[in-house]
Amino acid sequence: MSLTTVKLLVLAPALALALAACNGDDVTGPTQAPENDDVAADVEAFCDDALGLGSPGEPEVDWETATEEEIAAAQQVFAEERLRPLVEDLRDSAPQDVQDDVATLEEALDEAEGSGDLEAFFGGAGGQARNAIAIEAADRCGWSSVDVTMVDYEFQGVPETLQAGPVVFSATNEGEESHEMIVFVKREGVEETWEEILGLEEAEVMERVEFVAATFAPAGEESTAAADLDPGEYVMVCFIPQGTDASGEEAGDGPPHFQEGMFADFTVE
């Protein structure tokens, strides 16, 4: 199997709301919600909108066969019809502390809608703005968190079981190579083991799983991913090829890391 990492990570920054504020034990439960009804309602709206930004879907395009022009056009539509409404919702619900960051995302979308390039939204100033919004969300929303260590070639600290609901995965890369964490859930009725599924061709794999979340961390760095998990059987996988440099900019020519054992399964109840 050789899933195209790039096409998954086009959306990873949106899925990887860098919730650096959620540190602590390997698994941390949700914090106390505000008691005041009005305050709770405001926080709930912000949390819903922040989580929506973390699960926006993807452009409608065949990544394998589309031309660069077709991909750009699809990303332009995605920016206009999907990302723009999400950011507009955040404009209404986000606290004052991150309103400047929402404005930065609006500017990034202006650029994306004009060019069909989502880099300004997913990276650079857009990425920093989303990080700030995510930190604010982590502080206010009380999502559970899971600390995961990535080494060459293993995920460490992954619990066997998690509770359903919003969860923040905080991934620290202590390896010599760059690593990613791509999270999938089995589709209903799938009975194969994760080892069997990951041994299939890409098209067959995607018939059996749904993409949930993704994040990437160069060697020595930390990144995070947030997702609203339903009950089911999950796995986190690293598809980066062996020999990729510490920054992730120069791809290696070896087998993907998961073939060296870098995948970990867990159950959500």
Q: Which residues make up each language-model segment?
A:
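Bacterial N-terminal signal peptides that target proteins for export
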Residues: 1-10
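Alpha-helical segments in soluble extracytoplasmic regions
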Residues: 45, 49-94
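C-terminal motif of bacterial Sec signal peptides marking the signal peptidase cleavage site
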Residues: 18-21
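Long amphipathic alpha-helical scaffold segments
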Residues: 103-109, 116-149
